Amino acid sequence: MNTYGEYLKVTIFGESHGPGIGVVVDGLPAGEAIDLDAVRIQMRRRAPGSSDLTTHRSETDDPLIMSGLYRGVTTGAPVAALFQNRDAHSSDYHPEVLRPSHADYTATVKFGGYADLRGGGPFSGRLTACMVFAGALCRQVLERRGVQIAANVVRVGHATGKELNFEMKREILDARSAGDSVGSVIECVVTGIPAGVGGLMFGGMESRIASILYAIPGVKGVEFGLGFGLAELRGSEANDPFVLKNGQVVAETNNAGGINGGITNGMPLVVRMALRPTASIAREQHTVNIQTMEETTLRVTGRHDPCLAPRAIPVMEAALACSVLDAMLDSAAVASV
């Protein structure tokens, strides 16, 4: 399925090297002012070709809005937007030679060889432009209700920190110069979500958020709060004791990342996602020619990110914006939306 959400539905379509890609955002409250300049700022944060740390593919990603906005305000109808693909180099791809760790083989099996896999087709990170657009709309709705979203890179390869630093950039550039790529971790913090947002089981915040984060190409791990670090602790260390502060129930610590039982507790929501090293690398790899059914080797050509993290920061923020707004529309917090 290409649609996410229950009360706020986000549908994304298109292929990396097709004429264009698009998104439909259905369920935005009517009467919400949308600053398109602010939307374009978010789009530029994700756009390729901005530095040596990213792919040199150049796309303007200026949205052609088809419906849902009139005089800068949401109408209550679905907001639909299209983005043209202007800088695709399809000659770089040979569909008969399977690219290791891409969707080439699995999509060929799933769709009987009919899928357009040039540049990754519908599996490409190119389509995250649509998610950023949707998230930019949701973000403005949330910010007017006091919800703030901010993400930063906290790991690239062996380098760590609170944001993209010199050591992390060196890891990326070293990988690129070696014809290779490197993995990363991004942390996102969402503040201002009231207690009581979320639900049971599949409607819980972890379930909702993990679902949309795993739709971002390259994401291989998601954790909340201390995440896997909780496995090393005892309950007395991991629990977040409650206290009263100015007449409000608050937690002394936030090891759970702002969620108890799938429902927000009023503390900052903290989530991290791990991104695999970009699968497209210029080093020789073993693979198979699916037409001749012979083993062969491949060096992936084309223009690719040596690390997914720099451009994935706004994508993660956008995903959280869509997920949080959907959950707030599906809870007692709807009164504040």
Residue ranges and their predicted role:
Residues M1-R57:
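N-terminal, positively charged regions that mediate nucleic acid binding
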Residues K9, A81, T278-V337:
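Internal helix-turn-beta structural module
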Residues F13-P19, G179-S181, I186-E295:
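Glycine-rich anion/phosphate-binding loop at the beta-strand->alpha-helix junction
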Residues P19-G31, G125-A151, G203-S211, M267-T278, ...:
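Alpha-helical support elements that line or immediately flank enzyme active sites
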Residues Q42-P100, D104-T106:
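Glycine-rich, N-terminal phosphate-binding loop and its surrounding beta-alpha-beta segment
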Residues E96-G121, V288-H304:
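Short acidic, glycine/tyrosine-flanked loop/strand segments centered on an H-E-D-like triad
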Residues K110-M201, M205:
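Glycine-rich, mobile lid/loop segments that gate access to catalytic sites or pores
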